[in-house]
Amino acid sequence: FTALSNFEDDVVQKKELLMRKRYWIYSLLTFLAGGRRQIFVVFAGFLLVEKFNFPFENVVMLTRVNAALTFWLAPKIGRLISFIGERRALTLEYVGLIIVFVSYAFVESIAVAIALYLLDHLFFGMAIAIKTYFQKIADPVDIAATSSISFTINHIAAVVLPALLGIVWVINHSAVFLIGAGIAACSLLLSQLIPNDPRPSLETRLLNTSTTLQQ
């Protein structure tokens, strides 16, 4: 206990909550990820239950299957991200999610809907690439404060979007998933700005922005 109480981190984290401009890609991807995930968490289950009369207890079982698959695939996803890089990993995720969300909008088969539900969750596992991208570009002293802000940003979308899309759902449930596909498409475009080798001073592929984004 004495050793633990005297432990000091090598890096002193900044306590003020400040989001630096050079982390703007990370911030936007985090915000979009929060909204995208809520469409899956809330409305994919609604689709199974309301459109296909899928028993609620079976939805719970699918959630457990997803958890088991995630546990098994997580190390493999991590190795894949290390091998192909964050931009390619996120590209794979977002292209997959666009296909899944568009398919949700028009699916007529319960078997296909269940397969989409499982694929949807697995693609979200690749979102860890957003965090590894941030770790590569961040000043170590900024990590704690910026992570706290990103948590808040993620949850702003998580709180606001389900309420708004709930109204859309009543009118046309397909529109909800097409909006989700649009969000995934925006994320796809944004992820293309991630460099092959992200690091401090090389946070984006945009030209002539390195100096301004340092602020």
Where are these regions (language model features)?
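Loop-to-transmembrane helix entry/capping segments in MFS-fold secondary transporters
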Residues: 23, 56-57, 140-150
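Short amphipathic helix-loop junctions that connect adjacent transmembrane helices
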Residues: 42-59
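Multi-pass alpha-helical transporter architecture, strongest
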Residues: 1-5, 181-213
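Helix-to-loop junctions at the C-terminal end of transmembrane segments
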Residues: 73-85, 169
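Hydrophobic core of transmembrane alpha-helices in multi-pass small-molecule transporters
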Residues: 111-125
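Transmembrane alpha-helix termini and helix-breaking/packing motifs in multi-pass membrane transporters
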Residues: 46, 50, 160-176
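Intracellular juxtamembrane helix-capping segments at the cytosolic ends
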Residues: 125-138
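Structural signature of the two symmetry-related core transmembrane helices
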Residues: 88-103, 181
